[in-house]
Each structure stands twice: as C-alpha cells, then as structure tokens.
C-alpha cells in the first residue's frame, strides 16, 4: 500500500539517491504525515503535536471524514481533506521555505452557510513536562498564533498565521493546549486563504517526514511475502529438545530474583501470547501444527490470553449472548484450552495462565450492586440484559472477589483429559496471573472517586480511605484522591494488597504450586504502583512503544525498554507478559517494527529479566480464511517474524552477557509515594540501564507493614536521587559495561557484538558497519541484520550460520495478506570457515542455493534490491 504512486520516476530516482537522514539535533521539527501538520520532538519524544479539531453545535465532534497527505518532492507536500458535517474542503501546499521555517498555504472552500457551530481549526498540544524548561506557550497578539520558549536563549518555536484567525486561545481546562480556529460560531460560504509559518530557532532541526527518511519507493512493487504461516522458516526446536515434555524438571518456582525449576535448573522463558479467537476457533490439527511451529521459532512459553473477554465469542464461558451467567465454564471451550496445553507441553513449551482478563459479569451472577457497574455498550446476555465490567470494583466488592475465586476453582481444578492432570497440578503451567491490567494505584482507583454518582462501591471506597487515614494519622481529604501522589498512593497500595493476598491465599489453598502474579504495572504507571505487586512471586510489566525506539535520547526521553527496566524490584524475578510496538493506526503498522525484537531480547538478557512474552502471536483463528494483518498477529507478519527467532537465540542461549554492575534506585518512603517517579520524568531510570543493571529497592513504610524493605545487593551502586544522570550531558550513545551492546540514539543505531550473535539494527543505510566478524554496507535506509551461530561455535568457526534480515513490510488494502516486503539492497560480508554454501527457502519451504562468493576468508552476499528473503542459511 502506498500514498506515493503518482510520484514521477525521475523524482523517485532523486529521492532514492538521497542519503538516509539521521538527526543532528535533539530538537526536531517535521510534518506529521497523519495530519499534514507540524510536530516537534525532543530526544525522540513528542514535545508538541498538532491535530485538526472541528466541532458542530454544543461541541459535538465534526472532524474530517476523508483526507490525503502526499510528499510531492523533498520538503514539499500537499494536503487535501473534506469535512462533510460542516460543509467545507481544505487544501494546503506545504514547503520548507528557509532552513528555519516551514510554510502552510491553506485554502478553505465552504460550500454553504453554517450557523450555531462551535467551529474549529488546529489544536496544538504541548508536553507539560517541558514547561519548567520552556515555559508555557504564549499567544501572539491579535489572534495571529503562538510562541514557545525563549527567543533570546533558545530553543524557540513560533506558529504565525496571516491574516489573523477568528480565534486563538489557550484551552481553559488544559493550559498545555492552544487552539487556533479557522471558523468560529458560523461558517460563511466562500473561500478563505490562510498562511501559516512555523519558525524555529537555531538548535532545532527541520527534518524530513518518516516516509522521506525511509525512501519514497513504490511499495506496491515490493515482492509478496513467501512465508508459510503453518510451518516455520527456521528450526530452533533444538532449544526445547531437552525439555520435552514441558514440566519434566518439576514446578517452576521463584528463588530470590530468579526463576528455577524444582530440580534447581535456572528457568528463562522467551514467550508469546496466543489469544482470543485463536484459542477457541482453531482446529485441533492446526493447534498441534502451531505448537510445533512455535517451538521451531524458538519459543518456550505461551500465555493463553483473552480466554474470558467479553468481545471474544465463544469465550471460556461460551457465547455471551447464549448464557445467563459466568458461573460455569463451557465444556467445548475447555476442550480447546486442554488441547493447547497438551500440544504445547509435548513441544517443550510451558504455559502461562490468566485467571481474569476482561470478563463481563451478568445480572444472574448475583453480584451485589450489579446495577452500578459500568456496562459494555451494545452487548447483552441471553436474557438481553446488559453485561458489566469488574475492573477496580473487585477491590471493594466481596461478591466480585468471590466469583473470581469460584472461577479459579473451576479453571485450575479442571482435569485435562489429555494430560490426566488438573491445571493446578501440571508442572507445564509456569505461572498464574490473578487479574490483567487491573491496578488501583495508577488506573482503576479513579473509578471509585466521589465525583461519580454516589454508589455503594464509592461509599465503601470512601469509608476504607477514611479508616486508613485515621489508622495511620494521614490527612483524610488527601487519602481518597486517587489521581494525586501522597497519602492516596499508600492507601491504594494497601487496598490492592488486601485483595491480592486474599486471592493468593485462596489459590495456595486450592493447591497452586507455581509462581502467582497479582496484576501488572502498565500504562505509564510510576514506581508507586510497585509495592502492591510484591504480594505476588513475580513483578510483571507491560510496555508498548511507537516508531523510533532506538532514537529515544535517555537524557531527555523514555522508550519502551525503560518502562520494563523500571519494574525490576530487588530480590524479585521480572516477567513481561506483553511487549510490542503500537500500530500508527488501525490499518498502518509501525514501519520499523523489525528493530524491536533483538533490542528487547538483548536488553532483557543484559538486565537479567526472567520471562518475556511478545504480544501477540495471534488473536485470530489459524485458518486460511482468517489471515489478516494486525499488530496482534506476528505469526504472519514478516516484519515482526523476521527477527523473533534471532531474538530467541540471543535471550535463551545467553549470547549477551548480564551486566557486571548493578545500579539500585533506593527512594525513601516519602520520595516513592509523594511524587511521580517513572521513566517519563526520571533521568536516572533511563540512563542507569544503559550503563548496567537497573533495580528498584522498596523502602520500609510504616503505613504498609506488609511491605518488606528490599535487601540491597552488596556490590550495587545505590542512588537515591531520581534526577541524577549517569551519562554525560552531551552523550549521543551508550555502551554496555560488557562492551557487547551499543546504542547511538543520534544515529538511530543499535549493535550486538558477541561471539555467537552479531547484529546491526536501525538506520544502517549509507554507512559501512563492521562488527567482530561481519561487515555491512546497505543502501536500504533502515533494516535489521543478524548473523548467528547455530552450532554453538563462534561465528568464524561455525559451520552452521543463520542470517536474519528485517525490513519494512506493508499489508495490502483492507489489512489483507500476504504482506509486501521491502527488498534489501547492499552487501553483507562474513568471516567464516571455507566450504560453506548459502541457502534460502522458496515458497514451498524447500532450501535452494543463494549466490555467494568467498575470498580472503570472507563470504560476500549481495542483496539486489529486487528480491527478498528474511532468512538465509550459511552451512
């Protein structure tokens, strides 16, 4: 799929010849291709983002119903959009007019008079965290725009409109938003032309769009992906050969900050999620085939997720519109879970079970206060009664807790006829999660606040808050305010822990032997969410990120792995049940998603994390007719799949050494609970993990007698200031203390250089990169290239090498597959023993020879920019 099919061949030649762009400055202004409007980043994170916003009467949304942004030439763009509700069309010509300015020539054509409308135009949203440094945005006189920063000192940015607009104002309830309205109160028929000029100071770079950086080739000409979704293009099943069946070493247990099997063998898990419809609508034969494929791809853990979710039909309860309650499990659905467990177990793959994800309660579940619970719009049970969400409310409603316990009894006590074991008695079950993404400390405490219609749940919450405040001498009016730091974070942790401990005690009484996880820290939770999680045996975390994760400057900006690292509590194993990119939209994947797997795997091994699960392998059934493109379907996405096996090798085999130095952030109780501390606002959390292993020490806290103070590791460097940076102020890259990992955020480049794995990831085009035994010279702007030994010998001695190649891949219209895959252009040189041959796999999965030359002890592989394979085998 391409938005540039009309670009002339002459222009294409010019653009493709341009060197790939990496950013020379920390501050970067560019055009957001989804809007055709300016955006400003600082260290890779958004500092200002602009969006069109229009409103009909009474602030009812009336945004564009169609639009198209196009790159006409380098730094020259056009934009067209239609607003049917308000009856006007918008066109814009956009260009870089000086080295420090971008200009928009807006042409608005209103077709009829509209009255009694709020109007609209452009909303500029600023990062409030930068107000300390930049100040708040200022309005230019006479409705002409706004400025931000200090013109004399810089950085400084200004957006000026001519002629003046109908209204430019700072949103009264959000001083981080400036609204610049083209129309206000009414729309008169006719044309108006408006010039907008974005001017930036020295030190702010005007950069190309994402598409320009990648190159504006016609993606419809890319070759179609040839990967078979039923078989694996590589075979790493040897990693599981000694573990069949899963559970042979006994139950998994948490020992200090590590996972072990019962026989004392260390346990590390590289996993994924099989979710929703994939669980219940896949045939038994295909489940067996996918279990074998998962093993061949290098996985040894699968989380069975969204088994109970309201939007999945059937779920573990059956079809929600055909049942009257959720007190009984569907025999047909249980059979599918049984078979998944059996097939995965046979392949040496362990299983992670969730007890609650998005279960919807029903009227006949006999929940006290059911009428008060938020309902799932448009969804009903068999009696046509609405169904309700339980998140947050389970902490203050014992009838919800009781029904969750009842589910656990049925689910974990169910005897799998294929294994003759109840789930609770099966050592192939690695861990159990009580409730998914359901914390009070950062999210669902807000559901219980008294600004809602008074209910028995809110009254219960307020009574508990008052009692906690009285018991511990805290300010009553501060203790219930869930959105604030201070006494509320103490109370919310305590309330969450009470429920967690009750559930843990119940599960242990049922006979659950494996580690129990309460819920996850997720959704930009701060460190004050961690204490309640220590009730469980593991700390679990979720993290998702957008494009350009390698370009995030840790001195100023957070990326996906920073949030994972900030959950590592001293003395506790760390699991990651969800990590991934986020698609830019429902139909547009993140272009550089091929960079993520190796980055996460190498970081995880360096940090010493214990279990990682990519989200997700699939949410759709494994059927020929269901093969769609999605962020949640790695199984058929060549851009994700390309490097997942390589990442499995890095992590499971220990190709990357663990950090030699530990850095422990040890906040006092006052620091932890009375202020926001997270990767978003702590430079220590971001920079420490670049230098060594990051751990969080939790303090003794009188109001939380159940919270055990962390025992500080003997050789760790202990730091108490969250604002202390461990990198120089002008740093542009960091190397691990082992010397094996290097990230240059200015160049958007990450390398792994070890005896068994050598990889280069990110903006590789136009550079010559040399690692221990490989040399890479690509014309393709961005890619991931990994060379790995499969026989356990160092690369230069190995006689069996895997080469993994990741590039962009785009789905066909309407999210159809197969994807079109960007062909690699350039050369790869590998120092290795003589006598090896190079192979690729054809569409039938058969090996076929691939051209390669050998001279002076090196193999030279040429990529022609026309054909593409994601895996090569030198053996």
Question: Which stretches of residues belong to each language-model region?
Answer:
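Proteolytic processing hotspots in large secreted/extracellular or virion-associated proteins
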Residues: 795-834
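Bacterial N-terminal signal peptides
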Residues: 8-19
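Active-site mouth of glycoside hydrolases
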Residues: 251-256, 260-262, 266-536
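Catalytic-core region of carbohydrate-active enzymes that cleave or remodel glycosidic bonds
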Residues: 499-516, 528-724
């Amino acid at each position: 799929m391409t938005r540039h099919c009309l670009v002339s061949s002459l222009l294409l030649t010019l653009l493709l010849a341009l060197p790939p762009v990496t950013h020379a400055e920390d501050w970067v202004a560019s055009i957001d291709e989804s809007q055709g409007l300016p955006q400003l980043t600082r260290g890779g994170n958004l500092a200002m983002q602009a969006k069109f916003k229009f409103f009909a009467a009474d602030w009812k949304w009336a945004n564009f119903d169609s639009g198209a942004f196009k790159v006409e030439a380098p730094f020259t763009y056009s934009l067209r959009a239609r607003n049917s509700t308000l009856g006007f069309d918008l066109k814009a010509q956009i260009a870089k007019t000086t080295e420090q300015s971008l200009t928009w020539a807006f042409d608005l054509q209103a077709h009829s008079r509209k009255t009694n409308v709020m109007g609209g135009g452009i909303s500029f949203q600023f990062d409030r965290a930068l107000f300390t440094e930049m100040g708040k945005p200022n309005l230019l006189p006479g409705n002409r725009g706004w400025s931000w920063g200090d013109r004399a000192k810089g950085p400084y940015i200004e957006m000026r409109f001519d002629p003046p607009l109908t209204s430019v104002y700072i949103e009264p309830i959000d001083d981080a938003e400036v609204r610049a309205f083209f129309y206000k109160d009414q729309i008169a028929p006719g044309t108006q032309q408006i010039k907008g000029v974005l001017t930036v100071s020295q030190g702010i770079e005007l950069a190309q769009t994402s598409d320009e950086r990648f190159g504006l080739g016609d993606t419809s000409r890319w070759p179609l992906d040839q990967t078979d979704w039923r078989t694996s293009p590589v075979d790493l099943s040897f990693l599981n050969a000694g573990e069949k069946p899963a559970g042979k070493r006994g139950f998994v247990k948490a020992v200090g900050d590590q996972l072990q099997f019962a026989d004392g063998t260390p346990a590390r898990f590289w996993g994924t999620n099989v979710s929703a419809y994939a669980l219940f609508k896949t045939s038994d034969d295909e489940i067996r085939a996918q279990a074998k494929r998962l093993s061949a791809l290098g996985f040894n853990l699968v989380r069975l997720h969204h088994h109970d979710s309201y939007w999945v039909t059937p779920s573990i309860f059956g079809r929600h519109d055909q049942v009257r309650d959720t007190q009984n499990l569907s025999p047909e659905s249980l059979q599918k879970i049984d078979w998944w467990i059996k097939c995965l177990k046979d392949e040496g793959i362990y299983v992670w079970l969730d007890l609650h994800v998005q279960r919807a309660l029903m009227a006949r579940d006999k929940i006290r206060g059911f009428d008060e619970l938020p309902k799932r719009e448009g969804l009903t049970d068999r009696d046509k009664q609405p169904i309700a969400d339980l998140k947050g409310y389970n902490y203050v409603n014992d009838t919800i807790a009781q029904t969750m316990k009842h589910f656990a009894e049925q689910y974990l006590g169910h005897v799998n006829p294929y294994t003759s074991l109840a789930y609770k008695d099966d050592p192939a079950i690695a861990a159990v999660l009580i409730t998914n993404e359901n914390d009070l400390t950062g999210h669902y405490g807000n559901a219980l606040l008294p600004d809602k219609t008074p209910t028995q749940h809110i009254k219960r919450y307020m009574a508990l808050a008052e009692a906690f405040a009285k018991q511990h001498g805290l300010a009553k009016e501060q203790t219930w305010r869930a959105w604030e730091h201070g006494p509320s974070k103490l109370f919310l942790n305590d309330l969450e822990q009470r429920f967690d401990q009750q559930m843990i005690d119940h599960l242990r009484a049922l006979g659950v032997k494996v580690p129990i996880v309460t819920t996850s820290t997720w959704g930009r939770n701060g460190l004050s969410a961690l204490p309640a999680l220590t009730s469980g045996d593991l700390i679990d975390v979720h993290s998702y990120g957008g494009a350009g994760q390698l370009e995030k400057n840790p001195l100023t900006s957070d990326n996906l792995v920073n949030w994972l690292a900030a959950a590592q509590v001293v003395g506790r194993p760390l699991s990651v049940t969800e990590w991934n990119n986020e698609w830019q939209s429902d139909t547009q994947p993140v272009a550089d998603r091929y960079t993520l797997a190796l980055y996460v795997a190498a970081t995880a091994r360096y940090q010493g994390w214990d279990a990682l699960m990519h989200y997700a392998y699939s949410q759709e059934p494994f059927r020929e007719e269901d093969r769609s493109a999605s962020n949640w379907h790695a199984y058929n996405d060549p851009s994700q799949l390309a490097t997942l096996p390589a990442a499995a090798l890095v992590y499971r085999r220990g190709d990357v050494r663990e950090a030699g130095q530990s850095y422990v952030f040890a906040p006092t109780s006052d620091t932890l609970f009375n202020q926001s501390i997270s990767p978003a606002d702590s430079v220590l959390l971001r920079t420490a993990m670049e230098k060594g292993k990051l751990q969080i020490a939790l303090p003794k806290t009188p109001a939380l007698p159940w919270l055990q103070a962390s025992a500080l590791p003997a050789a760790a460097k202990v730091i108490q200031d969250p604002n202390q940076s461990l990198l120089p102020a002008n740093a542009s890259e960091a190397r691990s203390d082992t010397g094996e990992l290097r990230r240059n955020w200015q160049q958007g480049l990450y390398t792994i250089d070890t005896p068994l794995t050598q990889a280069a990831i990110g903006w590789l085009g136009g550079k010559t990169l040399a690692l221990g035994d490989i040399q890479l010279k690509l014309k393709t702007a961005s890619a991931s290239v990994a060379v790995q030994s499969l026989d356990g010998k160092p690369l230069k001695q190995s006689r069996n090498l895997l080469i993994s190649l990741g590039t962009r891949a785009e789905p066909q219209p309407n999210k159809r597959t197969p994807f079109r895959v960007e062909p690699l252009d350039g050369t790869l040189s590998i120092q290795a023993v003589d006598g090896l041959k190079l192979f690729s796999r054809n569409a039938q999965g058969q090996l076929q020879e691939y051209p390669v030359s050998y001279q002076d002890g090196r193999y030279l592989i040429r990529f022609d920019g026309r054909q593409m394979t994601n895996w090569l085998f030198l053996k």
